[in-house]
A protein has these predicted regions:
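Hydrophobic single-pass membrane-targeting/anchoring helices
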Residues: 2-34
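Sec/Tat-exported extracytoplasmic proteins
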Residues: 77, 85-88, 108, 200-204, ...
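N-terminal "mature-domain start" segment
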Residues: 28-98
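Short cysteine clusters
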Residues: 73, 104, 190
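A short, solvent-exposed beta-edge/loop patch
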Residues: 138-208
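Extracellular/mature segments of secreted proteins
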Residues: 79-84, 111-115, 167-168, 197-201
């Protein structure tokens, strides 16, 4: 049976995408979405028919990067945001759907992309490698730290990277298409999420 924490985390990914879109539409007075307007109700995400990933494990962390007390909107520097084509001001919010995790949305006006960083402080990133999660995963690294690329069934316009930063903590990076025509391929979005994760870890390492 799927644990309550895991079920809420999976649901939070779909809900976070709606929140990120809403922030992009309202924070600067300029519509970010030119197509695929967000639904008025929460999306239903189904998890069926994907292979289990229980045999995959994360590599050891080189050190620990505690996220407790970190402001997610200050993780990426202005120069890093420029390099990632995220040219708007970071917008903080609290993910009320998942234990009030601190999160930050940053959009790219020219690139038509949106990035979201969220700090999960009550479980480890390896929760995504459980077959209970029923998502498509690929283990990677982010500036030397173990990470997982997560593709959620039914959500092709976004990609997540979960960085194993410390025991029972991880950095969740969401990178999504902001309504481009044609839409950005998910493979490209996953590469974008990895770039954001790399930059975020690089910045966090300077704080420790």
């Amino acid at each position: 049976m799927r644990t309550p924490h895991l079920a809420r985390l999976i649901a939070a990914i779909g809900i976070a995408i709606v929140i990120v879109i809403g922030v992009a539409l309202t924070s600067g007075g300029r519509p970010m979405i030119t197509a695929n307007e967000p639904p008025t109700t929460r999306p239903t995400v189904r998890f069926q028919g994907l292979p289990p990933t229980t045999t995959v494990t994360l590599t050891p962390r080189p050190t620990s990067l505690s996220l407790d007390g970190v402001n997610p909107c200050t993780i990426l520097s202005s120069s890093q945001r420029a390099d990632l084509s995220l040219d708007s001001s970071p917008t903080p919010y609290t993910d009320a759907e998942f234990d009030k995790a601190k999160a930050c949305s940053i959009r790219g006006l020219e690139s038509g992309t949106v990035a979201r960083l969220a700090l999960v402080l009550n479980m480890g990133a390896d929760v995504w490698l459980s077959d209970e999660a029923q998502v498509q995963t690929q283990t990677v690294t982010a500036d030397g730290f173990p990470a997982i690329v997560v593709r959620t069934p039914g959500l092709t316009d976004a990609c997540n990277v979960e960085v194993d930063t410390s025991d029972n903590e991880f950095l969740d990076v969401l990178f999504r298409d902001g309504g481009n025509t044609p839409p950005i391929p998910q493979d490209t979005l996953c590469l974008g999420a990895q770039r954001v994760a790399e930059a975020a870890v690089s910045s966090l390492k300077l704080r420790h």
